[in-house]
From Swiss-Prot:
InterPro entries: Chalcone/stilbene_synt_C (IPR012328), Chalcone/stilbene_synt_N (IPR001099), Chalcone/stilbene_synthase_AS (IPR018088), Polyketide_synthase_type-III (IPR011141), Thiolase-like (IPR016039). One of its GO terms (biological process) is flavonoid biosynthetic process. Pathway: Secondary metabolite biosynthesis; flavonoid biosynthesis. Belongs to the thiolase-like superfamily. Chalcone/stilbene synthases family. It comes from Gerbera hybrida (Daisy). The primary product of this enzyme is 4,2',4',6'-tetrahydroxychalcone (also termed naringenin-chalcone or chalcone) which can under specific conditions spontaneously isomerize into naringenin. Keywords: Acyltransferase, Flavonoid biosynthesis, Transferase. GO terms for molecular function: naringenin-chalcone synthase activity. This is Chalcone synthase 1. Pfam families: Chal_sti_synt_C, Chal_sti_synt_N. The keyword Electron transport does not apply. It comes from the Eukaryota.
Length: 398
């Protein structure tokens, strides 16, 4: 007997009507703040490397050029003194690192998530999906499970755990959240990125300067967003709509950024030409993303770019002829927090919407209608998310 079930009607009923929308943002950092001007002296002292005078001078120059004013780090001097293997360049220390991050990564994520949930203004029971992302450690059950317990989310919340993706993953989680929100009517997706550099901290080595670059750039932080389609405008306040999302591997970029989890922790390897590879390919990604909208003036859109380092931002700016203010929010987050891997772009979204409101810009995107979010990371992998801002004058009905 033929079925009378209308599968198209079932599928249509499962889908949202409108685009995925960012509804709330929260951020968090550890309490321990490290100022970049003081960091070279601290770093070489705590790693017992003060005899490496020339290398210390190189590191000072790296820190001076980093455009970073301060960073936040969970690991303190006292902790490193208790765990000296973490201060060597290549000493077995994975157990110690893991013991720390499997506890602290979910805790820092909880802090950011609670802020996002508070801003959203709805009970946690309305969260239907959880995406958790970290490059800091691996465990089973994962950080997604731990956060579910810490927040008291429903046992039936649909979880997705992303480990070891690196710096492009802030775009990846938004792409996944967009698909979940738009294909599950009524879904409210909690997205959390939490990063702690305890997995990558190590002492200096004069034959591996790429490792030293990481020590000058990386910081700790967590960020969370609530994503959903068809917001209830009486109780929810849209911040940005996600129009499209894409991922690509850049040509001829294999080995440009690698990370390997070993007994010594997570080791990073960076080629010098990472800024060149990104700047050479970025216009193609922009053209692909914005040609459907008829946009080809890159100064007419707002920018949220992962701040991998100042050289990347400088070369992208130069290649595209961007005005200095285009990367203001990105450079501000780099200056005040360093490179927090996957969490960075979410911090930048938060910075942009706050400054747009403070400055009376008219929209959440610095007064502009359309914008781009870029994530860059291992692969080289690039995530491109097209955003549509909303008027800053929109208020929640009471």
């Amino acid at each position: 007997m033929a079925s009378s079930v209308d599968m198209k009607a079932i599928r249509d009923a499962q889908r949202a009507e409108g685009p995925a929308t960012i509804l709330a943002i929260g951020t968090a950092t550890p309490a321990n703040c490290v100022y970049q001007a003081d960091y070279p002296d601290y770093y070489f002292r705590i790693t017992k490397s003060e005899h490496m005078v020339d290398l210390k001078e190189k590191f000072k120059r790296m820190c001076d050029k980093s455009m970073i004013r301060k960073r936040y780090m969970h690991i303190t001097e006292e902790y490193l003194k208790q765990n000296p293997n973490m201060c060597a360049y290549m000493a077995p220390s994975l157990d110690v690192r893991q013991d720390l991050v499997v506890v602290e990564v979910p805790k820092l994520g909880k802090e950011a998530a609670m802020k996002a949930i508070k801003e959203w203004g709805h009970p946690k029971s309305k969260i239907t999906h959880l995406i958790f992302c970290t490059t800091s450690g691996v465990d089973m059950p994962g950080a997604d499970y731990q956060l579910t317990k810490l927040l008291g989310l429903r046992p039936s919340v649909k979880r997705f755990m992303m480990y070891q993706q690196g710096c492009f993953a802030g775009g990846t989680v938004l792409r996944l959240a967009k698909d979940l929100a738009e294909n599950n009517k009524g879904a409210r997706v909690l997205v959390v990125c939490s990063e702690i550099t305890a997995v990558t901290f190590r002492g200096p080595n004069d034959t591996h300067l790429d490792s030293l670059v990481g020590q000058a750039l990386f910081g700790d932080g967590a960020a969370a967003v609530i994503v959903g389609s068809d917001p209830d405008l009486t109780t929810e306040r849209p911040l940005f709509e996600m129009v499209s999302a894409a991922q690509t591997i850049l040509p001829d970029s294999e080995g440009a950024i690698d990370g390997h989890l070993r007994e010594v922790g997570l080791t990073f390897h960076l080629l010098k030409d990472v800024p060149g590879l990104i700047s050479k390919n970025i216009e193609k990604a922009l053209t692909t993303a914005f040609s459907p909208l008829g946009i080809n003036d890159w100064n007419s859109i707002f920018w949220i770019a992962h701040p991998g380092g100042p050289a990347i931002l400088d070369q992208v700016e130069l290649k595209l002829g961007l005005k200095e203010e285009k990367l203001r929010a990105t450079r501000h987050v780099l200056s005040e927090y360093g490179n927090m891997s996957s969490a960075c772009v979410l911090f930048i979204i938060d910075e942009m919407r706050k400054k747009s409101s403070e400055n009376g810009a008219g929209t959440t995107g610095e007064g502009l209608e359309w914008g781009v979010l870029f994530g860059f990371g291992p692969g080289l992998t690039v995530e491109t998310v097209v955003l549509h801002s909303v008027p800053t004058t929109v208020t929640v009905a009471v």
